[in-house]
């Protein structure tokens, strides 16, 4: 929004400099982007009157003039402008004047004729106005007046970058209100009196879309002189706000737009058939706009039409056919309130961006239409003449916005601002902003004015109080946070430690959505009904996840489709389990999951490339488990296809339950081939998922004495049924080993010649040692015999020769 400082000071004139004013505006939240002078730097230019104008005797394109600038003698000036003529009021640079670019005016002769000055154009004075020839001033311009003073050129254009919520400041009226509040200064509005009708002509108005157009005003003005010249003062105000003068009717509607903040439009009355109808467009309806382009309208677009055709896109752009031209004699002035929701986005859909649409999208004061209509009528009659008809108004009270009523708590105000502002000051600030304020038990209740659509919640009021009070006036305070040592529980296993371990083992952490596709989830977690979202982002994100495996598998597919054959991922996140006894009927459980696919290692010329298998992931998971528990605390139990706990998403012969302290807390296994096909996985994929609560604590290590005596190793080979887990045999050895057995390790499994069918041979290394003495053969033999006997009794094992 660009505005002229001098125009603003006509409304409110605080005793501050330009720099102070722009700083105030910026600190109030209306950021000033730029401040530019409205004209170049020049001196010695006066208002003059061309008393005589004749042809130069020796040059066809030059004229010899005598100009009165209020001095005793007329000035002889030679001018080459085609519009120079007798009786014209002009801007005269006298001898000694300095124009922009340090151009000095001196006495001269042009083709033998003396020239003691120069008749100036806008461009020569650094004024950004498109013109052809010298300036033509109003007849009432006082001869001899300093031109800078006459046109008020000691002025600046201020460019303010308004945020989307401050539509009320898209006008001189709104900015004056703001500056008045900041400086406790009175705002002087121009006198606008109702224009008395002199004729009774009316146009019928029908609003078929009252929700989109709650108020529509129309007024006929006949016998308008559209050939009249827009006054220079109005042209200058428009120019300084970045709007080019077009014709007096358009200039007046633009002037009211800038001054009052109310967009208006003028129709050629002769081109309206039957009356005005405000309706939604018909799909595909065509309208030629004022810029000559043709718009194909959508059914959600509000239009102003007559009984046969669309005349304009409401609040956005007028139509060419009904626009005012040089032939227009009678006009219909339109002034309406269009609901922001029915204008927002429509301009962009047609590739348009107008001053009107920008204001209507953000919200126009819905109490402004009557006074804006009278202001436009007043200016139109003053400049173009005409006969005025009564205003025809159609209004839907029920569809007009209602003022927002917002409660403000004293405690909340102090808490957010971090500073106590006196009650009287709070009330004064809000009332100066136009709000109606009443006291309440907890603070106040304020009703927003009609021009403030953005005041809707308590924080909005707090912001208003803070910015008007002045953020600079709120003293700085050091944070009052108390520093204390947090109790570190050594037994807690930090998630970061697990993350670091997995990353060190070649994994990448993934974060997948908690919302999943429900039908796909049934393939991974059958038999459990998830929580279904009532308003999902999309159909494939309509259910809360029951586990992390589904998201990880989809991530593997995503990577494989992008030429990433080797994938190692892990994720920590919540699963959402329906539970009637839980809060909100849902239990949220933190889980840790991982997946591997592709080759075991990166491609290397000296290393054989092998595909990952179950034991690769099992080894990585064991490394995680060893962070939290001793070896006896966890185990893996194979799940047969017949087991009730078998997971149908996993391969029946390559999956296991994860047991911690005797409780099943997770699962590990190869993805079922059928599930691989349905997900679109490329090759073998192994996954695990475990409850984080089961592994987030660890066994605190205890320091033990190291034996100074030698250790002894004895190897045994036992034959057992193939169904017996080797881990169970090792654990049985440790159970029976007594004080001398320090370790038992499986180092070989053999099936084949010399071993009965259905059996397998397990070779186990037993390490024995004493803290007190060197073990004798009898000690070692006794321990080994006890272990063999225990294994034989428990598993039917036989010692292999």
Swiss-Prot record:
Domain (B5) spans 401-476
**GO terms classed as biological process:** phenylalanyl-tRNA aminoacylation
Any one Gene Ontology molecular-function term assigned to this protein's record: tRNA binding
Output the Gene Ontology cellular-component terms: phenylalanine-tRNA ligase complex
- Please give the InterPro entries that the UniProt record associates with this protein: aa-tRNA-synth_II/BPL/LPL, B3/B4_tRNA-bd, DNA-bd_dom_put_sf, Fdx_antiC-bd, Fdx_antiC-bd_sf, NA-bd_OB-fold, Phe-tRNA-ligase_IIc_bsu, Phe-tRNA-ligase_IIc_bsu_bact
The entry's localization annotation reads: Cytoplasm
Query: Which top EC class is given?
Result: ligase
Q: Where does Mg(2+) bind?
A: 454, 460, 463-464
Domain tRNA-binding, chain residue ranges per copy: 39-148
Origin: domain of life = Bacteria
Q: Report the coiled-coil segments.
A: none
Record has Transferase as a keyword: no
Q: Which residues form the FDX-ACB domain?
A: 707-800
Q: What is its EC number?
A: 6.1.1.20
The note describing how and how many cofactors are bound reads: Binds 2 magnesium ions per tetramer.
Cofactor(s) for this UniProt protein: Mg(2+)
NCBIfam families noted in UniProt: pheT_bact, YtpR
According to the record's subunit comment, the protein's assembly and interactions are: Tetramer of two alpha and two beta subunits.
* Family of this protein: Belongs to the phenylalanyl-tRNA synthetase beta subunit family. Type 1 subfamily.
PANTHER family, alphabetized: PHENYLALANINE--TRNA LIGASE BETA SUBUNIT, PHENYLALANYL-TRNA SYNTHETASE BETA CHAIN AND LEUCINE-RICH REPEAT-CONTAINING PROTEIN 47
Q: What is this protein called?
A: Phenylalanine--tRNA ligase beta subunit
Organism, as annotated: Vibrio parahaemolyticus serotype O3:K6 (strain RIMD 2210633)
